Amino acid sequence: MSEYISLEQYNTYRIKSFAKYVYFPTNNQELLDIVNNHNKLFFLGNGSNVIFSKEYYDDVAFVIFTKKFNSFNIIDNYASVQAGVLLQDLAFATYNASLSGIETFYDVPASVGGALIMNAGAYGDEIYTCVKSVTILDLNTKQIKKYLKKDIEYGYRYSIFKYMKDICILSAEFEFEYKSKQEIKAKLDDIYSRRLSNLPQKPTAGSVFKRPQANMPVGIMVEQLGLKGKQIGDAQISPKHGGIIVNNGNATGQNILDLIEFIKQQILEHYNIELHEEQIVI
C-alpha cells in the first residue's frame, strides 16, 4: 500500500480515481487481517460493473482480488476457482480441457467473484448454470461458510450474495460438461463475431440498466429517441449500442452518472418506464 494508488486499471470504464487504501491479498489470512483493520471496505474484482463517483477515496479500503487472489484448479470436469480469476481466463482453460459451460463468458471482462454476486449473464446463459458451490467470508463473525447451489437464491442479474451485507466471496466450485474443442470453438467464434459487430470497443462497463419489466430492451428505446451518441463530458451513449455508455478518454464518474440520469428521465418521460441501474456506484 502507498499514498493514493490509481484505480484506473481496476475499473473497465477506466475512470481516473485514486484511493488511499488499496490491498492485494494472496490468501484468506491476509484478507482477514485487512478486514480487522478497516471498518469500510469494498471488494473489487475486475471493476467491470462499477462506477467510481469520486476522484479520491480516503474512507474506503479497496481490496482487489484479480492481481494475486486468482488461482484455479481443474480436475476432470470440475474446477475450484478463487474469486479473482477472470472469466476470460477460466473460459480458455476449460476450452483447452474440452469442457463446456463457461465459454459464453469468455469476452465478459469480469472476475468470478463479481460475476457470482451479480449472476452475470451473456447471450442467454447465466453463470450459476455451472456452479456447484460458493464459499464466502462473513466479515462480522470472521467465519468461512460454503453454500451449495441448492441453497443459493439467484435470478436475473442478482444472487443472494448481492443482498447479504458484510460478506465477501472467496471461491467457487464449478461442474462442466465434456464437449469437443471444435464445438466449443464454434461457440467462441460466434460470440466474438457478434460482439465485434454489436458492442463498442472503447472503455465501458457493459449494459448500464437491467431489462425493464416491460421487456423492451433499453438500447432499442434509446435508439428510437435518437439518443445514441449523446455525450456529457467524455461519457457517451455508444453509437453502436444504446444501452451502453463508453468513456471517450477522460470521462469522470460524475459524467457517467449525469448521463445515466438523463437517459432515465428521457425513458420515463416518453415511455413511462422507470429504469434501474445494473451497475454499482461507489
From Swiss-Prot:
One Gene Ontology molecular-function label: UDP-N-acetylmuramate dehydrogenase activity
Function: Cell wall formation.
Keywords, in A-Z order: Cell cycle, Cell division, Cell shape, Cell wall biogenesis/degradation, Cytoplasm, FAD, Flavoprotein, NADP, Oxidoreductase, Peptidoglycan synthesis
InterPro entries linked: FAD-bd_PCMH (IPR016166), FAD-bd_PCMH-like_sf (IPR036318), FAD-bd_PCMH_sub1 (IPR016167), FAD-bd_PCMH_sub2 (IPR016169), MurB (IPR003170), MurB_C (IPR011601), MurB_C_sf (IPR036635), Oxid_FAD_bind_N (IPR006094)
GO cellular component, one term: cytosol
Pfam families: FAD_binding_4, MurB_C
Catalytic activity field: UDP-N-acetyl-alpha-D-muramate + NADP(+) = UDP-N-acetyl-3-O-(1-carboxyvinyl)-alpha-D-glucosamine + NADPH + H(+)
NCBIfam families on file: murB
Domain FAD-binding PCMH-type positions: 15-179
PROSITE patterns according to UniProt: FAD_PCMH
Name the record gives this protein: UDP-N-acetylenolpyruvoylglucosamine reductase
Cofactor(s), by name: FAD
EC number assigned by the record: 1.3.1.98
GO biological process: cell division; cell wall organization; peptidoglycan biosynthetic process; regulation of cell shape
First-tier enzyme category under EC: oxidoreductase
Catalytic residues of the enzyme: 157, 207, 278
Coiled-coil region list: none
Pathway assigned to this chain's UniProt record: Cell wall biogenesis; peptidoglycan biosynthesis
Positions of disulphide bridges: none
Membership in a protein family: Belongs to the MurB family.
Localization of this protein: Cytoplasm
